[in-house]
């Protein structure tokens, strides 16, 4: 290889390496992993996952594959959460039972009157039993403002919306039916929920 050709070759290799490093650091590659809560969708909304809860805890982007019963993935949503009442650190936000047999978790966020509504998508996770179900509630300044319909194994994706206009703080409650086993079965009734694209709108 001639001297000039070698120099050009090394310049090309160096540029390619820098481009690869930039993709790795910025996450701009189309095949990059799940986007974090800081992702800017350019629609004026704020990811709920970017707020720090002052009470309670919900485990956003908890590393569990957010695939629904139809095989659709929500891993490229602004945020996501998979909720199953089972063993494992990824489920530790569902610490309590309700009297009617639901695993329960919640988080409260200070929103300081900045937002008019909270929206998200609800879908049955692939671990949802055939008789399982799940639902959520939203409170604004301790007043119940929205309750979702039950999410069941054969449910379509639900576009959920809660009016939180003027609220200083909001509370999101998650209820997952806690049955006897995960998976198909005649008595299977465990719930398994995907919450995705939880956004606050000014």
Q: What is the predicted function of each stretch?
A:
Residues 30:
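Short, conserved catalytic or interaction motifs in soluble domains
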